[in-house]
């Protein structure tokens, strides 16, 4: 299972001109299952709600329904506190990483280099060619 950080989901759904197609192609090319947390859902929906865009909001929720929803029980928050203290991560970043670790995900795809440094190999800046065996995500 690969945990998707909110930034990649946003690039995909909002069809970011530079990254949206790359994210879509990588997901389509992968045999892995993809998971997201309630935090990813929260972060993704903010822009659509703020702009009053129900079509975009629906596009996000339709994608959420096709991904594995990963719960965030109390141990995730306790691990996030450890990660914040040890690596100076912001709370949302620490929660993403802790959730991926808790669910024993094989990878956490992100574009955040701070997560790649703190994760000891779990998180990968998926928009860099070396992060997925030499191919761009």
Indicate where each model-derived feature is located.
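Acidic, PIN/NYN-like endoribonuclease modules and their adjacent C-terminal/linker elements
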Residues: 1, 66, 97-137
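Short, well-structured N-terminal submotif of metal-dependent ribonuclease cores
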Residues: 1-36, 48-59, 126-137
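Short beta-strand scaffold positions
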Residues: 4, 35-36, 71, 91, ...
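Alpha-helix capping/helix-boundary segments
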Residues: 8, 40, 76, 96, ...
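Conserved SAM-binding loop
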Residues: 12, 69, 89, 108
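Active-site charged/polar residues at nucleotide-handling catalytic sites that mediate phosphoryl
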Residues: 30, 87, 103
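Acidic catalytic patch
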Residues: 66-86
């Amino acid at each position: 299972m690969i945990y998707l950080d909110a930034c990649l989901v946003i690039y995909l759904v909002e069809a970011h001109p530079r990254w949206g197609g790359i994210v879509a192609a990588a997901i389509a090319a992968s045999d892995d299952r993809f998971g997201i947390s309630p935090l990813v859902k929260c972060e993704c929906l903010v822009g659509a709600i703020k702009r009053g865009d129900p079509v975009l909001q629906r596009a996000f929720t339709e994608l959420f329904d096709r991904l594995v929803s990963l719960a965030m029980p109390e141990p995730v928050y306790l691990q996030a506190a450890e990660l914040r203290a040890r690596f100076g991560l912001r709370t949302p970043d620490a929660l993403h990483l802790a959730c991926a670790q808790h669910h024993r995900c094989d990878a956490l795809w992100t574009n955040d280099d701070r997560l790649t440094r703190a994760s000891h190999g779990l998180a990968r800046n998926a928009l860099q060619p070396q992060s997925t065996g030499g191919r761009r995500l």
